[in-house]
């Protein structure tokens, strides 16, 4: 049996550079119904697929992808027919944990870079790391990072144990990690001063 894929998806991560695309498509049922969903694995250069690379601030090779009557065979089905609803829920949970860990890592890298800068930069002959106000701000950054680690680790543990709390904990980890990264990266830039928005340091 063959299937016809039509539709579009915006902001596909690595969509501009991928050779294969995993597509979630409705093969039965109606919109809003969690059943009747099937995963297909499709060659990115197949006729009817159009990829438009987006210029973004990061390096994830985002793309908008359009499917115009793309023919795929039943051999392209990933998993079983019309069982993708449950699979997608699991994938989204794991995806939240993965992006949480990435944001946590970025926050920790920004913090460590800032600590090094505080120990090296002098103002009026005095290391700025000796200023109590900056010490307080660095301590807050450290506390938020350590608390975020606990949240991410709890979500990872729930994934390993296939816990019923996985969705809740993965969502929590993503929320907390995002807030922590925002706080730490902003503080890191502020503590670096004007040089914090240049390419001379990774903070910029």
Task: Name what the model sees in each region.
Residues 17-19, 35-36, 45, 60-66, ...:
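A generic structural signal for well-ordered coil/turn residues at beta-strand boundaries
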Residues 7, 40, 65-67, 107, ...:
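Residue-level signal for inorganic ion chemistry
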Residues 43-77:
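Flexible, small-/acidic-enriched active-site or ligand-binding loops
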Residues 2, 6-50:
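A short core secondary-structure module
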Residues 1-4, 57-59:
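Short, ordered beta-strand-loop transition motifs
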Residues 2-4, 81, 87-204:
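Alpha-helical interface subdomain recognition
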Residues 13-17, 29-34, 55-60, 80, ...:
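Solvent-exposed alpha-helices and their adjacent loops that cap or buttress functional pockets
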């Amino acid at each position: 049996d063959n299937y016809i894929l039509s539709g579009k998806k915006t902001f596909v991560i690595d969509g501009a550079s991928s050779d294969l695309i995993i597509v979630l498509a409705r093969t039965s049922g109606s919109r809003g119904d969690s059943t009747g969903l099937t995963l297909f694995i499709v060659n990115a250069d197949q006729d009817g697929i159009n990829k438009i690379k987006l210029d973004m601030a990061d390096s994830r090779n985002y793309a908008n992808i359009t499917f115009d009557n793309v023919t795929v065979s039943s051999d392209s089905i990933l998993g079983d027919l019309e069982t993708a609803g449950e699979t997608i829920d699991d994938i989204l949970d794991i995806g939240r944990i993965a992006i949480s860990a990435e944001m946590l890592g970025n926050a920790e890298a920004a913090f460590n870079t800032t600590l090094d800068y505080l120990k090296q930069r002098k103002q009026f002959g005095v290391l700025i790391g000796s200023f109590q106000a900056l010490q307080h701000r660095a301590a807050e950054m450290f506390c938020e990072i350590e608390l975020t680690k606990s949240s991410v680790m709890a979500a990872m543990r729930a994934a390993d144990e296939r816990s019923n709390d996985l969705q809740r904990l993965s969502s929590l980890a993503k929320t907390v990690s995002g807030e922590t990264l925002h706080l730490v990266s902003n503080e890191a830039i502020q503590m670096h001063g004007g040089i914090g928005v240049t390419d001379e340091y990774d903070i910029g």
